[in-house]
Amino acid sequence: MSDISPDYPTLQSIGWPWPGPPEEAAWKAVFAAHPQALPARVVEQHRTGYVVADTPEASLKAESLPEWQRPRFPSHERAAVGDWVLMEGKRIVALLPRRTSIKRGAAGAHYHQQVIAANIDTVFIVCGLDADFNPRRIERYLLLVGGGGAQPVVVLTKADQTEHAEDALAVLEELEAQNIPLRAVNAKDPASVAALRPWLGDGRTAVLVGSSGAGKSTLTNTLLGTEKMKTNGVRENDSRGRHTTTHRALIPLPSGACLIDTPGMRELKPTGEEDLAEGGFSDVEALAAQCRFNDCAHIAEPGCAVRAAIEADLLDPERVANYMKLRVEVASAAEKLATRVAQNNRGKGSGKRPASIDRPGRR
């Protein structure tokens, strides 16, 4: 790590968002509170701690804030891969505000949020064109991305292993109509993967998300031009992978961009902050607003614009069914979130530290 002053041009090479010192008031305030600290980016996240870097070539194990080590400390308020922190020596002394993020509801009965990646420009939703292909899961990922400030791009891998790539793209054409880019690639072929270049320019940060075995690590290796990430095969009976990536890591690419690889995620629960219109269902939401009844369930009500669109083959009925399911899940999570916020507000008077819920803005 540097021990003099921030080298902003070098920091830009790992995603620093400005040519010099921070320009946002919230960031300036944190810097002012820690005048001796230097910025660094979280490039690895492990159960035992973090690895941070202030150049593409050098990194170090960092000592986290003491409160982050408390079992009941909100997980989404701890640093995640992609976060910017302030360092004094090897110690993290502050977490800088997130500009964007992708989050999910953590597994378990109690309400928690988990940050998958922070300060990202693009989310590559990776899905294999084999038994892994699942439009409903893609829609769930799009919901989690929506409202977080990053651009979603659906990447269909293993395009070389199927004759049905065009059929898969047709299934997802309703998404493309909402300006959600779709790309079918052979993850092992640099010429094919070049289709992702528009989102991997100098200083930009992208994250790969998708199920285990979808080809995320293979895609990472091709973009790097080297076998940096370990890859395994997939089970022939169900095309499921063996969790090649075991932790989240930020990797500088030759293009000047940064790429975050993530382990496959089995559970994708909403946080309650999602916006269905921004999460891949803007067309369904627009039609729902035209229904005769405000509380239309889109099942058999008269004057239902959504059912009319389905009957006219303008909407995929399975996609609408998934929309209805996700709408219920978001509403349920929103109730749990409201309860948690109310509990935190009551805790203010007792001297307990409230757990804030960050809502990143669009970049």
Swiss-Prot record:
GO (cellular component) term, any one: cytoplasm
Keyword RNA-binding applies: yes
EC code(s) of this entry: 3.6.1.-
Chain segments annotated as coiled-coil in the UniProt record: none
Region (Disordered): 340-363
GTP-binding recorded as keyword: yes
Cofactor detail note: Binds 1 zinc ion per subunit.
Domain CP-type G: 112-268
SUPFAM superfamilies named in the record: P-loop containing nucleoside triphosphate hydrolases
A single GO molecular function term of this UniProt record: metal ion binding
Residues that hold Zn(2+) according to the record: C291, C296, H298, C304
GO biological-process terms attached to the record: ribosomal small subunit biogenesis
Short name of one Pfam family: RsgA_GTPase
Keywords, sorted A to Z: Cytoplasm, GTP-binding, Hydrolase, Metal-binding, Nucleotide-binding, Ribosome biogenesis, RNA-binding, rRNA-binding, Zinc
Subcellular location per the Swiss-Prot or TrEMBL entry: Cytoplasm
Disulphide-bridged cysteine pairs: none
InterPro entries associated with the record: G_CP_dom (IPR030378), P-loop_NTPase (IPR027417), Ribosome_biogen_GTPase_RsgA (IPR004881), RsgA_GTPase_dom (IPR010914)
Signal peptide span: none
Binding annotation for GTP: T157, K158, A159, D160, G210, S211, S212, G213, A214, G215, K216, S217, T218
Function of the molecule: One of several proteins that assist in the late maturation steps of the functional core of the 30S ribosomal subunit. Helps release RbfA from mature subunits. May play a role in the assembly of ribosomal proteins into the subunit. Circularly permuted GTPase that catalyzes slow GTP hydrolysis, GTPase activity is stimulated by the 30S ribosomal subunit.
Similarity-based family: Belongs to the TRAFAC class YlqF/YawG GTPase family. RsgA subfamily.
HAMAP family xref list: GTPase_RsgA
Subunit structure as annotated in this protein's UniProt entry: Monomer. Associates with 30S ribosomal subunit, binds 16S rRNA.
Name of this protein: Small ribosomal subunit biogenesis GTPase RsgA
